[in-house]
């Protein structure tokens, strides 16, 4: 029986990529800078980063290969039990869809559309079309913004007027924040569908519904009912090939949204690290032969990376690490565990955006030979390795190391 379990540690980069200069990210290192800050005693209430299980899988060694420096505080004198390395991104952007699609064998070699202006970000003709087609009383925002700050700035006015909050970032995204109770969740989703259609000429990667609750400035909180409306991947991914071969592909968290529901046979919802881990373990127990279980642990990115919360990111990493033994106990002889990321989001870096970084490539299980797999020239080596292991058609990009 062959099964693959992919744990996507969203935004967990391990060192500035070779082309980081094109993105203003030279020197970024999500893992390295978190580890350094913890080891130096710079984070109140924290000591050195403690990741014993990830270290056994080769995380520290992968970090050293990627950046030239072993992550401070991690155990270097450890017997590594998995295959470890790092991968450079071929895709043109440092965004979520590009990273996920490339990992599954489909790099994004075209340029996404972006809204570059920080104020009055969206074209007026687009805004007018949205107002008309959705029957809106108007809109708020129309700017680059932090997803939490924009709620404090505009949340009360949104509740009072019924005008949705429209904002973007350095990514190829159009984000819409609305109050779940005063505006309505389904109404927000309907608005996102309308915007997704209107954005077709602009080549924007995602429309993101950002529902929130709360009564006023200072206590607004985003809920777990986020929904991403992605464009379709431009070619079949390893997930499509598994589904077409009669296998199962289980999406946990936002995976199905990122792949626009393509190649998915079962969707499982989950919010927060604890619930995502619980759902993952449940699906591992239930998985049959020729199954991929794919979980996105989004909190690393959304709650800690973008918010530049070093302590929160470090604590979340340690919690994630503490759950790994539960997964290991469930593994059977034909199982492969993959731990990786889709981009970086260094919480010590300036701004609030993603960082262009190498990603960790960690494979573990009885079919996997322990040791370094070195530098991988594309994230697609991960998908190609999974395809080869399961006897699926060869992907157009990537080289298997299994």
Curated annotation (Swiss-Prot):
Origin: domain of life: Bacteria
EC number, as in UniProt: 5.4.2.7
Biochemical pathway: Carbohydrate degradation; 2-deoxy-D-ribose 1-phosphate degradation; D-glyceraldehyde 3-phosphate and acetaldehyde from 2-deoxy-alpha-D-ribose 1-phosphate: step 1/2
Keywords tagged on the record: Cytoplasm, Isomerase, Manganese, Metal-binding
One Pfam family linked to the record: Metalloenzyme
Cofactor info, note text: Binds 2 manganese ions.
Matching CDD domains: PPM
BP terms from Gene Ontology: 2-deoxyribose 1-phosphate catabolic process; 5-phosphoribose 1-diphosphate biosynthetic process; metabolic compound salvage; nucleotide metabolic process
GO cellular component, one term: cytosol
Places the protein is found: Cytoplasm
InterPro entries cross-referenced by the UniProt entry: Alkaline_phosphatase_core_sf, DeoB, Metalloenzyme, Phosphopentomutase_DeoB_cap_sf
Cysteine pairings via disulfide bonds: none
Cofactors demanded by this protein: Mn(2+)
Residues binding Mn(2+) 1: 10, 342-343
Principal cellular location given in the protein's record: cytoplasm
Reactions catalysed: 2-deoxy-alpha-D-ribose 1-phosphate = 2-deoxy-D-ribose 5-phosphate; alpha-D-ribose 1-phosphate = D-ribose 5-phosphate
UniProt feature coiled coil, ranges: none
A Gene Ontology molecular function term of the record: phosphopentomutase activity
Residue sites binding Mn(2+) 2 per the record: 301, 306, 354
Annotated family: Belongs to the phosphopentomutase family.
Function: Isomerase that catalyzes the conversion of deoxy-ribose 1-phosphate (dRib-1-P) and ribose 1-phosphate (Rib-1-P) to deoxy-ribose 5-phosphate (dRib-5-P) and ribose 5-phosphate (Rib-5-P), respectively.
Record's protein name: Phosphopentomutase
Species annotation: Aeromonas hydrophila subsp. hydrophila (strain ATCC 7966 / DSM 30187 / BCRC 13018 / CCUG 14551 / JCM 1027 / KCTC 2358 / NCIMB 9240 / NCTC 8049)
Organism phylogeny: Bacteria, Pseudomonadati, Pseudomonadota, Gammaproteobacteria, Aeromonadales
Gene: deoB
